[in-house]
Amino acid sequence: MLRTFRIGGIHPPENKLSAGKKITALATPKQVIIPLSQHIGAPAQAVVKKGDLVKVGTLLAKAGGFVSANIHSSVSGKVNKIDNALDASGYKRPAIYIDVEGDEWEETIDRSETLVKECTLSSKEIVDKIAASGIVGLGGATFPTQVKLMPPPGNKAEIVIINAVECEPYLTSDHSLMLEKGEQILVGVTILMKAVNVNKAVIGIENNKPDAIAHLQKLAVNYKGIEIMPLKVQYPQGGEKQLIDAVIRRQVKSGALPISAGAVVQKVGTAYAVYEAVQKNKPLFERVVTITGKAVANPSNFLVRMGTPISCLIEAAGGLPENTGKIIGGGPMMGKALISAEVPVCKGSSGVLLLTTEESVRKPIRDCIRCAKCVGVCPMGLNPTLLMNATEFQNWELAEKNYITDCIECGSCSYTCPANRPLLDQIRLGKGKVMGIIRSRKS
């Protein structure tokens, strides 16, 4: 019997319209806008200035703190300016504008397709290389990878878990990456294992991707300590705590990190980025992004340079449909509506979803009928309707007492609510407020 996590969960329609589409390199735009905040933590600090010439892979900004990440140029050209620019958050924040001239790469980057299996670096050297290359988690959280590979005192890694679930509807970037870059991913996993000194890794893949499972299982025979584990389809299995529960049957306590359960969790795309950084000296400046939607002419998986406007993906997929109601950065469950198609692709951009006008209309909100469906599907075992009420009445003490900060913002509660209550929207606001109160209490 296939495993899955044991608390809550839903089964939204998959709508994997771009499944089976080969990864295609998207043409480089005339100008890229590269935000200095593409990760959780402190913004990176620019080390270039207006007029500087850069190459593909040139360091543009250094990590601004322990929890931060370097940022590299995705193009060759001239720095036009450093100014505020609109990003996926909806805010204007510092970014580097680069006018593209040619496609000259840093000489240290190995651009060959030759597979490099053996890693001769020590654990510390691997972590340092990952940090220097600006690698972050390529899911939505974009947590700097090197920090995850340095467990706090008193914690020891026992296993590396690779999140290849891709449970978010519509998105297929990870699926396509597994089919086309399977061997490189496995080498990346062995590097991650070496970085945290463990001899066991599990790649969790939902069983709606049988081709990826079969492909990686065939390749993994030649890689000691790596298991490919098919999982029962259930959303949000890609959540760290849910995946740990599914794979090793351990539950991470409230407020604790995955390492407390002995697990280091990384996205499959991150494993590939680690391979490229450590074995090919290639910083993280491009990634696979899905562009999709029921009205999209050609749903696709594109290899996109960071800083490329979303509009370029839309044009390459057949243009903006006339009946487009919303542009979503990410998927329909955890993604957020973008206020402009000129928002640039960043390290955390897994997909772009175009919803039709009909799909974008919110249903009328009605009174809660106390059915408790939201409680039953919450993968964190929370009471969403109570947390929404606490937020509406600004009862922050009640919200904190009922673990609002444990919410992973998966949207399962809103999805299942028969009264169409904006549970996630309100909980998100309340969570942000409570986290601010907790931070001020500690300072």
Where are these regions (language model features)?
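Histidine-anchored nucleotide/phosphate-binding helix
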Residues: 179-195
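Acidic low-complexity segments
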Residues: 86-143, 154, 210
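N-terminal, Lys/Arg-enriched amphipathic/low-complexity engagement segments
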Residues: 1-47
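Hydrophobic alpha-helical positions that pack around
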Residues: 198-310, 316-321, 331
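Conserved hydrophobic positions within beta-strands
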Residues: 77-79
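Ferredoxin-type iron-sulfur electron-transfer modules in oxidoreductases and energy-metabolism complexes
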Residues: 349-365, 375, 379-443
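Gly-rich Lys/Arg/Thr-decorated short loops/hinges at beta-loop-alpha junctions or inter-strand turns
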Residues: 106, 137, 160-174, 295
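Short, well-structured beta-strand-loop connectors
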Residues: 49-62, 81
